[in-house]
Amino acid sequence: MTRLAPTKKSVRTTSSTGNSVDLSKFNEQQKQIYNRIENLANFDCELELKDSVNVKFKNLDQAKKDEIYDLALSLKPWRKGPFLLDDIYIDSEWQSFIKFNILAPHLNLAGKCVADVGCNNGYYMFKMLK
């Protein structure tokens, strides 16, 4: 299993000297990442919701696995999670399952419509499907 660790680096709008940083390069990289995600083929997969959100792909060749791995690397830093994409474990700075597991016994979401606003990664959205 490949384990990807979170990074402590963050994007800043000023440099260490206090000068403004041109975010156009960052915005262009972001557009490239979105395009790569949109161009991914639809994969047949199984979803399993445990402490991590697990996605098991069916009939995925090594080239596609490598593409997913490279795309996952480009999405760093990972703040919330964890996620398991086939054999790629994406660790995170904040272990979202700890908080969710504390709240879950007190939540009755059956038949409810829930807006997962501001989580920045969808972890809780996936967990609320359960």
Where in this protein do the model-derived segments appear?
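Conserved class I S-adenosyl-L-methionine
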Residues: K112-N120
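Conserved SAM-binding loop of SAM-dependent methyltransferases across substrates and taxa
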Residues: N121-K130
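N-terminal auxiliary segments of SAM/dcSAM-dependent transferases
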Residues: M1-L75
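Short, well-ordered alpha-helix to beta-strand connector turns
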Residues: G111-K112, K130
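Catalytic micro-motifs at enzyme active sites that drive phosphoryl/nucleotidyl and oxygen chemistry
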Residues: A104-P105, D116, Y124
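Class I SAM-dependent methyltransferase Rossmann-like catalytic core
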Residues: F83-F97
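Conserved alpha-helix/loop element of class I SAM-dependent methyltransferases that forms part
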Residues: E93-G111
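Charged, low-complexity
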Residues: P77-R79
